Amino acid sequence: MSFMSLMANTAHQLWYPTSFPSMKELEKEEVRLETQELAIKQFGFRTIRPIGLNRSMQEQLDLEEQEREEANQDTELDEEELGSGSFPEEGEMDDMDGDNEEVEDHDIEEVDLDADITNADASEFYEDISEYGFQN
């Protein structure tokens, strides 16, 4: 038997098997492939860091969950404050507003931000505007 005939015979057996797998074997192979695919997806989800992000997708989800829990704790604290009646009365709120209006900062010196820009109204361009027939 020559090498070419052996290769042809082997290829034929690979592509056209004499016995076909049973349904159980096919289902078992399908489950194996699905678990392998899931493992690959989860591996990437836990370890690969996308470009521009400093954490993996799993780390990002964990961080978002932690932030949600902190926000829930903050809302629980706010609800406790509502129940305790620690907020000021209406008259007290008016007093607080009056205090804010009286505050003035005299220590802050105003800075002209466009001091180095020439004023267009004072430039030489507009001095001889009557030459061009424009009226003010």
From Swiss-Prot:
Coiled coil: none annotated. Keywords: Cell cycle, Cell division, Mitosis, Ubl conjugation pathway. GO terms for biological process: anaphase-promoting complex-dependent catabolic process; cell division. Component of the anaphase promoting complex/cyclosome (APC/C), a cell cycle-regulated E3 ubiquitin-protein ligase complex that controls progression through mitosis and the G1 phase of the cell cycle. The APC/C is thought to confer substrate specificity and, in the presence of ubiquitin-conjugating E2 enzymes, it catalyzes the formation of protein-ubiquitin conjugates that are subsequently degraded by the 26S proteasome. The lineage of its organism: Eukaryota, Fungi, Dikarya, Ascomycota, Taphrinomycotina. The APC/C is composed of at least 13 subunits: apc1, apc2, nuc2, apc4, apc5, cut9, apc8, apc10, apc11, hcn1, apc13, apc14 and apc15. InterPro entries: APC_su15/mnd2. Residues 57-119 are annotated as: Disordered. It comes from Schizosaccharomyces pombe (strain 972 / ATCC 24843) (Fission yeast). Disulfide bonds: none annotated. This is Anaphase-promoting complex subunit 15. The keyword Cell cycle applies. Belongs to the APC15 family. The keyword Transcription does not apply. One of its GO terms (cellular component) is nucleus. Residues 61-82, 89-115 have a biased composition (Acidic residues).
